[in-house]
């Protein structure tokens, strides 16, 4: 039993020895959390912040600012479970003054302005169940607009304001939503968003200038400068960072100009549409056709090439063609060329293709086939037939003297022989006699125009006078009853090709 009684006594002895060691470890242990300090500002938290601080811990830290300046302390968060500040508290002390202790039951000021440039921060904890501890920021008296790392855009209602962020706010727990272009949701942490936007650095902190405006439906998130921005939903307000020289007028001018240009464009469009429908009596016809916009000559317009295309109006071209056709139809068509001569003027098919009578009288050797004297009161051209027979002209046939005997008297044609002694004057319509056996004379037109049979008009054999009788030849010449005179001497007979073309 001694052994049994000695066992509990040994355990009690061990507990008595270890308890002071445990208490000494908690008391001497580092109970400080996140600490970032710079020349003018810094941030300090309890251990595990914003989680529960540990039991029986001590955190002691001396902070200073340049000499000649005073310290400004701001408590962003203080959550200590103790109500009497006996074992858990926060205390600030300087060479001349002491501030605290502060705990859950005591009123804690948000800001402390000290009369010195140095202060000692002491945080102690005992046995507790919950509590976040504290978050402290500080800065020199040069930055009276100091804010903590937990300040959000929704905490301020001014449209434009400026604040000073201390060093060390990047790793403080808290979310931001948005980006530099669209702005940040008003629930975002100001100093953390400023680091995300690149306005300040986490090691030094700095001043930020903010502009509060109407919120948007969605905020895009991204990672920048070691800070992750999350996607955000619709919010009533948002804030944007501006440069120090930028004011509200500078930000509002682009929006106002855009709205003014939009309204001006809509007004001009409405006026142009109204003028196009109703018309403007004070504007020229060209302006009404093209609207109210004037033609603008561009300085870099391409010059017109030297090549060009001539276009014709189809209607004008058709009108000219019809005029030409009408004028051509008014004249007589060009007859076929007979013999070796060239036709120099237009005439009817029934008109002799010789020169004027004036020229025939002057030169009897001029080119031409026939000399037809005109009687007064008669038309120069052949008249249409008065009966219903087919209107065909009597073919004119010239043959060589050697073929004269091939035509019979029944065919309606008679080939006269040469008359070496008979002469005719130009006034009587005659021609000089043939000089050789090869020269031929033409055929006389029958006195009666009535054809013997159907088909072509053929002169009857009995209607011809004997061409060898000078008396009958003289009588025919003086009569001039629309007959053809004999051809001039010296004309070559028609060849076989010309005869085929005539027929």
UniProtKB/Swiss-Prot annotation:
Tell me which InterPro entries the record gives.
Answer: CUB_dom, LCCL, LCCL_sf, Neuropilin_MCO_CoagFactor, Sperma_CUB_dom_sf
Q: How does it sit in the membrane?
A: Single-pass type I membrane protein
Pfam families reported for this sequence: CUB, LCCL
Q: Where in the cell is it found?
A: Membrane
- Phosphothreonine-modified residues are 406
The segment(s) forming the CUB domain are 32-141
Q: Which residues lie on this side of the membrane: Cytoplasmic?
A: 272-503
Leader sequence residues: 1-25
- Bias-annotated ranges (Polar residues): 494-503
For region Disordered, the annotated ranges are 410-503
LCCL domain segment(s): 143-239
Which positions does the record annotate as the modified residue Phosphoserine?
305
Segments on the Extracellular face: 26-250
Q: Which domain of life is it from?
A: Eukaryota
- Going by the UniProt annotation, this protein carries glycans at 55, 247
What UniProt keywords apply to this chain's record, in alphabetical order? Disulfide bond, Glycoprotein, Membrane, Phosphoprotein, Signal, Transmembrane, Transmembrane helix
Disulfide linkages recorded for this protein, renumbered to the chain, are: 32-59, 85-103, 149-165, 169-191
Q: Where are the transmembrane segments?
A: 251-271
SMART domains attached here?
A: CUB, LCCL
CC terms in the record's Gene Ontology section: membrane
PANTHER family xrefs: DISCOIDIN, CUB AND LCCL DOMAIN-CONTAINING PROTEIN 1 (PTHR46806:SF1), F5/8 TYPE C DOMAIN-CONTAINING PROTEIN (PTHR46806)
Q: What is this protein called?
A: Discoidin, CUB and LCCL domain-containing protein 1
Q: What phylogenetic lineage does the species belong to?
A: Eukaryota, Metazoa, Chordata, Craniata, Vertebrata
Please name the gene that encodes this protein: Dcbld1
